[in-house]
Amino acid sequence: MAGLTIVADVSEEPISADNVREYAHIDDGVETTVINNMIKSSRLYVENYLGRSLLNRTLKYSIDYVDEVDQPLWEGTRIGPDMTIRRRYLQLPRPPVVSVTHVKSFDDADTETTLASSKYYLDNQREPARIVLRNGETWPTALRVANTIEVTYVSGYGAAR
């Protein structure tokens, strides 16, 4: 199924249980596990609300197909072939994108092919960030129906503390 999955989650949270204890004047008797769970759930809530990764993590984004370019309806007759044009980029969710690890495609026999990094570049000057094909390059063809392209990338503002 196409979607976004976490490959490697954050190694530590933005604040520690001791910081919370000190700020909220909580006794040492309260379990650290409870406080750590509250910190993690708070971070996840903020990330889901914002649609962003606050701390660096590795994500895998799988898609079923590359969208086609929207073309306006044509009135009258047109001379030339009727063809579809694929977009030259893939938008990546959960900004900010730090780096792309790899872009892979899968054919009907589930054979994995890694797209050479010289064939695309990361455009993270805009949001959402996107992978853009270089001039003269095309997306792989003869792909399977589901999860045809997989992008693994690092997203987030940096490590905790």
For each of these PLM feature ranges, what is it?
Residues 1-161:
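Divalent metal-cofactor coordination and adjacent catalytic microenvironments
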